[in-house]
Amino acid sequence: MNKIYLPASKMQDLETIIKESWELKVRLNQLSLDERKIIVLSGDHGVGKDVWAKLMKTKNPEIEIIRFADPLREAFEKAGIPGHSIDSLKRTCFKFSEFKVDGYQLDGMTMREALVHVAESNKVKFGQDYYAKQAIERAQKALEYSKLIVFTDMRFLVENKAVQDFAKANNLYIVRINIPEGLPKIEVLQD
């Protein structure tokens, strides 16, 4: 897949982005809900996998977006840090002071360090497939009302295996799309 180039002045309007990006328009129009399938979005950190998923969902609202990190983000939200703050704080040097998530002390850690610490601690405590199992449970429930499930953050072999096993058990076809660098950040779609 080629890089997507859009004029900076038009990066805020979803309809304009879809209209002006031939490649994006073609990809979105190729989404067929005739058969049940899984789309796995891959790409470097920060290239816009979640943005692509949201664009797909805008085009086809029946799509279910699942992130392996959702339970981790929900744990931080329960502790008082909303999702949009998580993303903002990851880009800063902010460090926690007297803060706990899921019982883990995060003093002196940046947001990224805290996310990794809680995730890895939970994997040690509950098994390496802790987050994969939760994502697959959500995907199984989503099959009751959706033919297309999009995973946006597959990072580990255990997650890949879980998705493959899930697809095989449910007779689903897996499509992998690599998101190129250069997809603009669309603030309208950010959490």
Please report, for each region that a protein language model flagged, where it lies by residue.
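Extreme N-terminal, non-catalytic leader segments
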Residues: N2-I39
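P-loop (Walker A) phosphate-binding loop of NTP-binding proteins
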Residues: G43-D44
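Conserved lysine of the Walker
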Residues: K49
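Hydrophobic positions on the alpha1 helix immediately C-terminal to the Walker A/P-loop
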Residues: W52
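Post-Walker A helix-loop "phosphate-sensing" segment adjacent to the P-loop in P-loop NTPases
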Residues: T58-I65
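ATP-dependent NMP and nucleoside kinases share a basic, alpha-helical "lid"
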Residues: E64, Q134-E187
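ATP-dependent small-molecule kinase phosphotransfer cores
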Residues: D70-S146
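Short, charged, surface-exposed secondary-structure boundary motifs
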Residues: A75-E77, G182-D191
